[in-house]
Amino acid sequence: MLAITQKSPAKINLFLHITGKRVDGYHNLQTVFRLIDLYDTLTFTVMDKAIGSHLPIQLVSDNPVTEQPTDNLIVKAATALLAFAKNNALFTQAQIAQLPLIDIHLDKKIPMGAGLGGGSSNGATTLMMLNTLWQLGLNKKQLCQIGASLGADVPIFIFGQDAIAEGIGEILTPITLPSQQFLLLKPDAHINTAALFQHPNLQRNCTHFDHTRLSQQRQDFCDILSPAFSNVFEPVVEALAPSVATALTYLKSLSTLTGTTPRLTGSGSCVFLPLPLTGSRHVPADMLSTWQHQAPTPSYIVKTLARGSPDRQIF
């Protein structure tokens, strides 16, 4: 049996703006995504039996990841890819029945509901790996289109590099940014994303910045956030989830030493503080260890993934 193990990374949003509402009822966003070295691990094993009329994969995880297996983005990704192949005459029904069953084992490390995109990353990794194992030959653009139908954060993990994201998150433009390190805190809070979008205090009319400004003025949103940049969900989540407010307060107490701006990532519960890699504000390892020990929530030290990282070279 052939077995391939693939890392599935998390992401953070350096800022997150809503720039208006679309005619389809969704919101237009503008954000900058960074991929980080916090991973789930997926192992794809090609079994010695055909799928027949069953689902093309079987998912195994050491920890339950959704109440219903069919709600998991790994399962949804496999189902969507198979449907795309069938609808575009890449497979006949007879060929589909002869495809080998793929066993997918998920080792879950990325916290769920954190705004780190763990489920979306798993879905993206599944699309890319099954595209290879089934020899479909789809390109990144096609896989991103399938991914966008599964969730707004899925395409960035197929894109595989730092990017400006617009639309609902599916319009991606590469951006070159310096390496960064972060202290992440994960409060124990469940955030209902749909409720956030409906919240009366949510800012929905942010300025849309052109790409030239974002590329040339990255100092306004990387280590610090200038007044023009924010995560619009942050004040709403703080008000709804006291544990998130506590975590942000803790990071703000550290920011006097780092000179950086703590913030929320995505629309989840995870917050982070950029850590200077060089200079007088560089935080030594023993101090970082103390900060983690004193943190009011589980914590992680992570770094950004370099463009072209081997962890994303699936094609």
Stretches found by the model and what they are:
Residues 127-164:
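Contiguous, small/hydrophobic- and glycine-enriched helical/loop subdomains that border
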Residues 33-36, 147, 251, 291-292:
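Hydrophobic C-terminal alpha-helix "anchor/cap" residues
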Residues 1-114, 132, 136-141, 186-188:
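ATP-binding N-lobe of GHMP and related small-molecule kinases
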Residues 157-159, 164-261, 274-278, 282, ...:
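Conserved, helical-rich catalytic subdomain that frames metal- and/or nucleotide-binding sites
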Residues 40-44, 153-157, 163, 271-273:
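Short beta-strand scaffold segments in enzyme catalytic cores
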Residues 51-67, 126, 148, 220-231:
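Short, basic/glycine-rich phosphate-binding loops at helix/coil junctions
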Residues 105-134, 152, 261-275:
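Glycine/serine-rich anion-binding loops at beta->alpha junctions
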